[in-house]
Amino acid sequence: MEDPSNPQPNQSNLSQCPPLATAPTPAPVRGPYHRRAHSEVQFRLPEDLDLSEPFGGFDELGSEDDLFCSYMDIEKLGSGSGSASDSAGPSAPRSDNPFSAENGGAEAGNSRPRHRHSLSVDGSSTLESIEAKKAMAPDKLAELWVVDPKRAKRIIANRQSAARSKERKARYILELERKVQTLQTEATTLSAQLSLFQRDTTGLSSENTELKLRLQVMEQQAKLRDALNEQLKKEVERLKFATGEVSPADAYNLGMAHMQYQQQPQQSFFQHHHQQQTDAQNLQQMTHQFHLFQPNNNQNQSSRTNPPTAHQLMHHATSNAPAQSHSYSEAMHEDHLGRLQGLDISSCGRGSNFGRSDTVSESSSTM
């Protein structure tokens, strides 16, 4: 505090005090809008660049890549600089640091601020080269904290942000590598499955072709068998026609004649039995008439008194039995011929049988 009684301080006291560092030029007043709006429309120089010192050439500013990298780092850390400064504040040296003002002022005067270097956009630089460019010794950082605490905080925040960015990048690379390995494994599995499916498809296609060929062969064999059966049927019919067993005109009625032949033997047997009974009755009537028309009355009387006995009638029937059996055999033979020739000879045979029975009865009556 100045003494109001001594408005002019002692010059010796002033000479003993170390020279104070000049206060930094205050930044121009910005508008109410966000500071990042300026970076989106125009390029601005970094704030840590000291324009008051003499310009030594473009080599001291660094390359265009360095300027662009610093610009990208400042824009990236604009939103998180406050929190980073709060976290770095307690650990960073403050105005009451052990460094004296004299050393700080001298070193600050001798040291020249350098341009910051950061990661390049393509990320081709290594960590060693980055640290070599942007690293600052702790004593210099302490001196800078005395001179420009805002700049020191920004440097610390940039270092922390670079470390976090590097960590995120490493994690992202690891994740991409893991995804690539997973996709390669899936591709290998799918390739194996595709090979199996292709082999199965090839096998099924060949089997399908073989089955189609076998089906065609079976169809051809069936057609050949049908044609062979037709030829055999025609050959059998031709042989029958050649041997005379079946005439061409009666070939159509061959099946019906065979069915009639199966029924004719039973019908012929019953008809012949009925015919024998009828013949026996006719024989009795004729015998009775014969005795009635005898010229001799004595004989008529004797015949009346002594009629033919049953034994005589049976003897007469037995004597006529061979003729009747012969007629039955002839009728069966004629029936067989009628079946082969498709003619109804059975009725004719029966008619002839009746004719023969009439002849036998007439011969017996003449006797």
Swiss-Prot record:
Residue ranges with Basic and acidic residues bias: 38-47
Localization terms from the record: Nucleus; Nucleus, Nucleoplasm; Cytoplasm, Perinuclear region; Cytoplasm
Hydrolase listed as a keyword: no
Annotated gene: BZIP18
Stretches for region Leucine-zipper: 176-190
Gene3D superfamilies: 1.20.5.170
Task of the protein: Transcription factor that may participate with bZIP34 in the gametophytic control of pollen development.
UniProt keywords, alphabetically: Coiled coil, Cytoplasm, DNA-binding, Nucleus, Phosphoprotein, Transcription, Transcription regulation
Principal place of residence: nucleus
Transcription regulation among keywords: yes
Protein name: bZIP transcription factor 18
Pfam families in alphabetical order: bZIP_1
SUBUNIT field: Interacts with NEAP1. Forms homodimer and heterodimer with bZIP34 and bZIP61.
